[in-house]
Amino acid sequence: MARKVQFVETVLRDANQSLIATRLPFEKFEPMLSTIDKAGYYAAECWGGATFDVCLRYLNEDPWERLRKIRAAMPNTKLQMLLRGQNVLGYSHYPDDFVKLFVKKAVENGMDVIRIFDALNDVKNMKVAMEATVNAGAIASGTISYTTSPVHTHAKFVEMVKELKEMGASTICIKDMAGIMGPQEAYDMVSAIKDAVDMPIDLHTHSTTGLAFMTYLKAVEAGVDIIDTAISPFSGGTSQPATETMAYALRQLGYEVDLDDKVTREMSDYFKGVRDEFIADGTLIPKALATDTQCLTYQIPGGMLSNLMSQLKQMNALDRLEEVMLETPKVRADMGYPPLVTPTSQMVGVQAVTNVLQGERYKKVSKEITAYCRGEYGTTPAPINEEIKAKILGDEKEVEGRYADTLAPIVEPTREKLAGIAKSDEDVLSYIAFPNLAEKFFEDRKAKEENCCAYSIVEA
């Protein structure tokens, strides 16, 4: 019997995050939700990552309300989100009580699969979120942030997979955020994990470097069970490979695929119009759809590269880009080879720019790099360069154990602080994650409600 390969659709989260910086309002995709629900996906990734921040910051949407509406419109498909371990959806570590309540509420509001990762692959930073997911009855997808370095070996990754399984992971995700995993590497890594544990494996990559289609085919050959794809109008470039193309290729190779082609055609026709609107208004820059092989040379993810370019442009120093690109891998090595994913990619990039423009390495460092060297972000894959660490920290003490253990509970004090303002625990969680954004959102919501009531009284 043919082996089945399942699909996760990313258009509602990572595809639009990668191509249009997550600026996809709910009303733009709402008409398609019941159609997506009929397509036959393993799951639809629709929440987490940058969506929470962007809903509040730019779209004036309640992210919790968005999740509830998606759930109501898609009763037959698993909903999936991306969670940054102890960072949840923010950029620094939070206390355990916040992590636990956030996961509990995400599941209560409709989440089925929580993909949990840590920027350093430090499982200590994933443990609380993993346990909370299992306790809430959802699927915990333990995630490896894929990267290459002298210390990132298959043996190391397999060891991590075994730890994640012990923590309660039901599936394992290999997350190649930079799109640098080649076909042979995918085959070897999936084979190594499959030999070690009997669990479904999901591979997530990006088309940035042009490798993704080939990488998926070899991964499937090695036994990968699930792949992440984007409906064709939102595929390619910094996004994922096209759903329809992968389904076609896999069927031709003799694999079973559950997707309904008639439904994916309907999705494609609809999202073409949405994509064209974003191209017309300049939100979708054609360059995001292009292939960029520089990542293979410098091992710098595409999103990080564009950030470096915009930073240098603002400083009138775009002519120093080549120096910064050569400095970035050196800073990464100094910092113990962290995977270049949020938030470590930003920290390493900013430090590389600073080193080049200051004309002296580590003359000036960000507070994030200082916190990183103190151990606040967790255990680094390799030790940080001792000489540089001493220069940065001076007499400052390093964190022992897990940084979150030093943080005081935050939920109860925030509930008290927001009495009369927060309508629910979801509001409390939004405020803890992004206080300024949530405060503004609550004010706007209140004003809207008051105007609405005033209007209806006049009407009556």
Label each residue range with its predicted role.
Residues 116, 176, 222-239:
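Glycine-rich phosphate-binding active-site loops on the catalytic face of alpha/beta enzymes
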Residues 152-164, 209-225:
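Catalytic cores of alpha/beta
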Residues 1-20, 67, 72:
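N-terminal amphipathic alpha-helix/helix-capping segment at the start of soluble metabolic enzymes
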Residues 235-257:
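C-terminal helical cap(s) of enzyme catalytic domains, especially alpha/beta-barrels
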Residues 31, 37-55, 285-295, 299-460:
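Terminal or standalone catalytic/regulatory effector modules within metabolic enzymes
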